[in-house]
Amino acid sequence: MTDHVRAAAQRMYAAFNAHDHTAAEEIFTSDFYSHPLGTTGPGSVTRSWQQFHEVFPDVQVVVEDMVVEGDTAAVRTSVRGIPGRQPPTMLEIFRVRDGRIAELWGLSSLRRDS
C-alpha cells in the first residue's frame, strides 16, 4: 500500500504552505537527510523553512503531479508567491519510512536566473 507515502508528502507540503515549522518534527524522521542541502534531521528542515518564509512570506508550493511507487514519491510542483519572475518549478523525490520522510532529493529552477 502506498497511501502512507502519498500522505507523508502531502503533509509536508501542507505544513510548508501553512508556515507550520514545528510540524517538521512529526513529518521527518530523526535521521532525515536532504541530499540537495546536505543537512540532517527535522531541525534542519525547520530552519530552512523559517529562512525561506522570512524572504518569501507569501510563498505557496502547488503539487502538479505525484507518482508513488513502493516507499518513494516523485512530486512535480510549481512555486507561487515569489515576486518578479515566472513561477519556479521543482521535482522532489521522497523516501518514506514508518510514515515519515527519511530522505529527499530535488531539482529546482528557483536558483536559475530568470
Annotate each predicted stretch with a short phrase:
Residues 1-114:
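C-terminal and inter-domain tail/linker signature
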